[in-house]
């Protein structure tokens, strides 16, 4: 099988805070979309992370944000990236969810379901408890989807 050219790979940008880590948040290859693990970092906190990384300084502590707000930040960012790639949430094929505390699964599932048009539109999903999440936040979510 011939190798694709770099022209086939497109980095997708959206109004989602970048942390300054060595990765892209979203990459489109043909009609496939790959979304990196998204922690619940708002623009303010992501800016503090970028600044600390640029200076080689200690990273700031994660702010005390209620879990419901963290879940909505992550899902809003996921939706923004999917739409920036030219797709929609119903076109996600696989989602991986890491929860810091599995006791929050019902609350997360309630929020998660609200981002899809129907039960039939839900993607395949793996959910697990993480030993440690980025900056000790409540969750992280990554996804694979397609552009119809």
Show which residues each predicted segment covers:
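N-terminal presequence-like segments and the immediate start of the first folded domain
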Residues: 1-76, 80-94, 99-148
């Amino acid at each position: 099988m011939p190798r694709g050219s770099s022209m086939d790979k497109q980095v997708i940008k959206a109004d989602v805070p970048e942390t300054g880590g060595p990765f892209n948040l979203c990459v489109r290859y043909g009609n496939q979309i790959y979304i990196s693990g998204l922690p619940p970092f708002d623009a303010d906190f992501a800016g503090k992370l970028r600044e600390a990384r640029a200076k080689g300084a200690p990273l700031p502590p994660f702010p005390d944000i209620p879990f419901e707000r963290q879940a909505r930040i992550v899902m809003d960012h996921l939706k923004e990236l999917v739409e920036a790639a030219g797709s929609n949430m119903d076109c996600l094929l696989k989602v991986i969810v890491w929860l810091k505390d599995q006791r929050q699964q019902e609350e997360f599932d309630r929020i998660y379901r609200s981002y899809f048009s129907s039960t039939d539109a839900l993607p395949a999903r793996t959910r697990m408890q993480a030993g440690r999440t980025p900056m000790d936040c409540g969750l992280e979510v990554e996804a694979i989807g397609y552009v119809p």
